[in-house]
């Protein structure tokens, strides 16, 4: 019998169509063609003039901005949907409201290597990528005109990636998006009724049950949500209660997040043959005012990964109710098995692999592999 499951945080309903269910391994992807050649890629070293001037770069001391030598580079998006220019005043357009699209759009280039998606990056490089997320998040959080910062990663053409070179995107905008408001309202309601954070409760319940847990380390729990909207939807959440991603501890927590993200994405890579996916970070942008007090208590930042293995069709668009043809318990078990196998990704042309093989214990904390990562002191350009 198909099930309807309700999301504890938002109240949304999801249909888990068990009679239409497919085996998790039936989602393995076919081989893909390259999206863009390296000789025309604006994100490759040597092509720095093809992008706007960098706003942040991790590079060896003594190297010039907007030149080769970097291992992380952040630039404004050339085709920005939001801009930090007008004042954003609302105006009438007949019976409708309109306003200038105030905000900033940035591209965070994860690696100089054109063909190194996040699952194959050395562990130290993923840490540096996470550090760039934190640096840019904190920078935009200081702007009083901005209300929300979203960091996202699109992998593969079906997920919206127009360039193959690994890169994330940042949107800092002057309004609160509906998805965040929906989560915030659910968190407020639960906090008022139960006196605790709904995300903390969810994490504790998932760890206790265990059937939807994919991976754990000392700081983060990776799990398939009970009311997952799509096959293999997976969340990464800090066990420490913290509302804003900007408050991530850039020591142990940064390393633990990098590990959790890389291990999970590599399980997708190994088990589903590098599927297209999106991930994004939901976070409260705290301004230090009175309203932030309850948000700090009730909300909890987290990262959501949604592989593009099914299509939202007329029913989903018409009702807002998603149909998931894989039980979250089954997808979590499948990913756990891939992690336990510890199979490494294919070697690149040089024979190097992205990360060292892991011990077959999905819940054990392991040190981030550091060989092959940037070894020199960081230089952050303004």
Could you say what each language-model-derived stretch is?
Residues 1-382:
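HIT superfamily nucleotide-processing domains
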């Amino acid at each position: 019998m198909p099930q309807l499951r309700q999301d504890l945080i938002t109240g949304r309903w999801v249909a888990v169509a068990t009679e239409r269910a497919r085996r998790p391994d039936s989602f393995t992807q076919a081989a893909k063609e390259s999206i863009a050649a390296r000789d025309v890629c604006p994100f490759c070293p040597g092509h720095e003039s093809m992008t706007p001037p960098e706003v942040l770069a991790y590079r060896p001391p003594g190297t010039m901005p907007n030149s080769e030598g970097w291992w992380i580079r952040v630039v404004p998006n050339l085709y920005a949907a939001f801009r930090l220019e007008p004042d954003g005043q609302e105006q009438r357009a007949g019976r409708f409201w309109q306003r200038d699209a105030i905000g900033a759009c940035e591209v965070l280039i994860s690696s100089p290597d054109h063909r190194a998606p996040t699952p194959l990056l050395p562990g130290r490089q993923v840490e540096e990528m996470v550090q760039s997320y934190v640096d840019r998040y904190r920078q935009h959080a200081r702007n009083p005109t901005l209300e929300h910062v979203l960091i996202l990663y699109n992998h593969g053409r079906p997920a919206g990636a127009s360039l193959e070179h690994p890169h994330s995107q940042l949107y800092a905008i002057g309004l609160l998006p509906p998805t965040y408001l929906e989560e915030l309202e659910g968190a407020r309601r639960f906090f008022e009724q139960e006196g605790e954070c709904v995300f903390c409760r969810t994490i504790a319940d998932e760890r206790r049950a265990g059937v939807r847990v994919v991976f754990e380390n000392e700081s983060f729990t990776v799990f398939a949500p009970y009311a997952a909207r799509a096959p293999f939807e997976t969340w990464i959440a800090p066990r420490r209660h913290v509302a804003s991603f900007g408050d991530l501890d850039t020591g142990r927590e940064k390393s633990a997040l990098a590990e959790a993200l890389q291990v999970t994405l590599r399980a997708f890579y190994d088990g589903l043959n590098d599927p297209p996916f999106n991930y994004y970070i939901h976070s409260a942008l705290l301004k230090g005012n009175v309203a932030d007090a309850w948000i700090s208590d009730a909300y909890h930042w987290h990262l959501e990964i949604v592989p593009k293995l099914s299509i939202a069709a007329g029913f989903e668009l018409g009702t807002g109710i998603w149909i998931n043809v894989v039980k979250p318990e089954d997808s979590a078990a499948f990913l756990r098995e891939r992690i336990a196998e510890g199979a490494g990704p294919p070697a690149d042309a040089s024979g190097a692999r992205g990360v060292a093989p892991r011990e077959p214990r999905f819940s054990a904390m392991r040190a981030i592999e550091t060989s092959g990562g940037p070894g020199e002191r960081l230089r952050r350009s303004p």
